[in-house]
A protein has these predicted regions:
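Alpha-helical transmembrane segments
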Residues: 12-15, 53, 82, 126
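Long, highly hydrophobic alpha-helical transmembrane signal-anchor segments
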Residues: 47-69
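Canonical alpha-helical transmembrane segments
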Residues: 54-58, 79-94
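Loop-to-helix transition at the N-terminal end of transmembrane alpha-helices
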Residues: 64-80
Length: 197
């Protein structure tokens, strides 16, 4: 019985070692990053199209601050659809001959972009709350409703983007150890470059 347990343990160790090696290959990492970027861009596009559709339908029937809420959703998501469309066009084809350096650079550049976007998202949400607060002090009802509707929309859209960008940041950040293992396979010395397999 002890031999069976030891054998199972040995097999599991070998399998996990093979998996650890296979998930640190450059093609695997490139493919995984490509899929993550494509999926997140498709999610943004889906969110935007859904908002455009729902707010487009609701705008004709809305009044008061609801009218302005749907109007701002339309403005906001026209931009989001454009961003998602450009992103999807850029992701039509995976880079067939990446270098370790280019993959690492792209990985960390994307993380920095997501953190910058997170800062912008916080600014959007804050601006939305400012508009909501401003709506309470407006003298005319039309301006009050406009600020309220626009503020609600900016809070909703900024809140979505905040969750979206932070989630993407943490997903991409979780790939950093895999990249580090890949980099650990390469070492430089005065005599040349050594690659471990």
């Amino acid at each position: 019985m002890k031999n069976v347990i030891a054998s199972i343990g040995l097999i599991m160790a070998i399998v996990s070692s093979i998996q650890a090696q296979s998930d640190t290959t450059l093609p695997y990492i490139v493919q995984k990053q490509f899929k993550l970027q494509r999926t997140s861009t498709q999610i943004l596009a889906g969110w935007s199209v859904a908002n455009l559709t729902l707010s487009g339908i609701a705008l004709g029937q809305a009044n008061g601050s609801n009218k302005y809420f749907h109007e701002m959703n339309l403005y906001w998501n026209v931009i989001n659809v454009g961003i998602a469309g450009i992103g999807l066009l850029g992701l039509r084809k995976i880079n067939e001959s990446p270098t370790v350096s280019s993959v690492v650079k792209e990985h960390y550049t994307l993380q920095k972009s997501l953190l910058l976007n997170t800062g912008l998202d916080i600014a959007y949400v804050t601006s939305g709350f400012w508009l909501l607060d401003k709506s309470k002090t407006e003298i005319t009802q039309v301006r009050s409703e406009r600020f309220r509707g626009f503020g609600q929309a900016v809070v909703v859209q900024g809140g979505f983007l905040l969750v979206f960008d932070l989630t993407n940041y943490f997903i991409h950040r979780s790939d950093s150890p895999r990249l580090h293992r890949l980099l650990d396979q390469v070492s430089l010395s005065g005599n040349g470059v050594r690659v471990k397999f």
